[in-house]
Amino acid sequence: GRTSIDNLCRIVESAIKAGATTINIPDTVGYTIPSQFKTIIKNLFNKVPNINNAIISAHCHDDLGLAVGNAIASIEAGVRQIEGTISGIGERAGNTALEEVILTIKLKEELLNVFTNIKHNELYRTSQLISQLCNTPIPANKSIIGSNAFAHSSGIHQDGILKNRANYEIIDPKTIGVKAVQLNLTSRSGRAAVKHHMHEMGYQDDDYDLNQLYVNFLKLADKKGQVFDYDLEALAFISNQEDKDQEHFQLKYFSIHSGSTGVSTASVKLLCGNKILNEIITTRNGPINSIYQALNNIAGLPIVLEKFHLVGKGEGRDALGQVDIVVKYNNRKFHGIGLATDIIESSIKAMLNVLNNIWLSNKIKSKIKNIKNKK
């Protein structure tokens, strides 16, 4: 946008005469808008006599948030190669997000009159891998590959999705390798979403009172934000008096010894119901791994840690550390959160949160089984 079109045409023509087979047209500082970039490309095709002897490529930056828009506009003008990166990773505000261009082409193939041979079902997995390798977290609201891209929390949207997914999804999540759509339970969720989650857990309509469950759900959602499946179970089947039993595993003491040798020793003491249990574990995989092994040995549950995320809350030496974890148990996912100035303590709190949720879920399953056996 900052180079005169006549100069650009002369440069492109000379480069092709010199043997260039691909000519890249860059918007290096993300300065142009789609209509402007489209005009530039059209002028090249109209004014450069040997333009068809080379592939014209576009290289756009996202300084104004228009990289993908400019890339699509350039395709409409005749460009046949787009330079970009997964997630738009790049200099300053980033480059063209390839996954957005790829999916746009797939959905608008007839309109754009172009196609790609990309394996679309590898997009999500590839983006996750690149995020890990580059240590660049993917924003939850990122188009196509963000965790919220196929997540629905509005009651109207959730009801529409359950009736016909095409109502609020322009593409099947499986197309890019996402296994399932998410219906997040929040204070905006309706009865249909709550009922759907209960059915997904195997409960029938006559197992619980949906109206009462929904009233209790809204109260919890207002306090907690997002409600998980095991929260619903507790609301549906555990009375207020029994809520006191939820903290079955309580921390009484912990100690960590770790040094430059790479060996960590964790000692932990828990109150489990009315029993005090101790465990000491030594590992070579760090203090958190040691303490988690010790906790798991006490709980005796076949759990698998799938996600561990640590983020600082505040600044300075007295800042809080928040640990969020996701644990898999019996093909279900349980979430835990812990907050403390000591990251080991916050890690323990997060795991105890998970263990207590699992314990309560097992208690509910046992209770329901006994009721059905009596019938």
UniProtKB/Swiss-Prot annotation:
Q: Pathway of this protein?
A: Amino-acid biosynthesis; L-leucine biosynthesis; L-leucine from 3-methyl-2-oxobutanoate: step 1/4
Q: Where in the cell is it found?
A: Cytoplasm
Task: Note whether Kinase occurs among the keywords.
Answer: no
Q: Where is the Pyruvate carboxyltransferase domain?
A: 1-124
Q: PROSITE patterns, from UniProt? A: AIPM_HOMOCIT_SYNTH_2, PYR_CT
GO cellular component, as recorded: cytosol
Task: Print the keywords alphabetically.
Answer: Amino-acid biosynthesis, Branched-chain amino acid biosynthesis, Cytoplasm, Leucine biosynthesis, Manganese, Metal-binding, Plasmid, Transferase
InterPro entries given in the database record: 2-IPM_HCS-like, 2-isopropylmalate_synth_dimer, AIPM/Hcit_synth_CS, Aldolase_TIM, LeuA/HCS_post-cat, LeuA_allosteric_dom_sf, PYR_CT
A GO term (biological process) for this protein?
L-leucine biosynthetic process
GO MF annotation terms? 2-isopropylmalate synthase activity; metal ion binding
The principal localisation class reads cytoplasm
Q: List the catalysed reactions.
A: 3-methyl-2-oxobutanoate + acetyl-CoA + H2O = (2S)-2-isopropylmalate + CoA + H(+)
Note down the stretches annotated as region Regulatory domain: 250-375
PANTHER family, per database record: 2-ISOPROPYLMALATE SYNTHASE 1, CHLOROPLASTIC-RELATED, HOMOCITRATE SYNTHASE-RELATED
Q: Which family does it belong to?
A: Belongs to the alpha-IPM synthase/homocitrate synthase family. LeuA type 1 subfamily.
Share what the entry says about its subunit structure, partners included: Homodimer.
Q: Under which name does UniProt file this protein? A: 2-isopropylmalate synthase
Q: Which organism encodes this protein?
A: Buchnera aphidicola subsp. Thelaxes suberi
Gene behind this protein: leuA
